[in-house]
């Protein structure tokens, strides 16, 4: 139960940052500046928002508590839902930017998806929201250039060098900061 609790705690804290980033986007507030200001308080440590939560632990373990705990695990369940939704939110933001580019330029953009792993500086793609976002964009017809410096190849699409991706892409999306 201790490991499940640790991972659920981390998931809840990440969900707070992810939900805050969605709200800041809605309100026109710079989430990074807001977090920096809030974190000046000695008892506040808001994490950095991302495109979701992945990996074989944090994205999975909270569900064991939710299923066993039922109604009483509503905060943990809510955090899982927020973090799962963040990838969908990112997909819509990217697709809207691509549509705007197409309307302004008369052609579909090439979109570089930077980072596919579930967290920075690893080669592990398990439960990766960045990988799922990239796959979904490709499925939805977006011209994607996938970049993941920690792997050489992927079975579903070509992995590009980041310098080449920047050179040939119209829109650059940083999903995972390596």
Feature-to-residue mapping (PLM):
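Structural/interface elements that position substrates and couple domains in central-metabolism enzymes
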Residues: 1-178
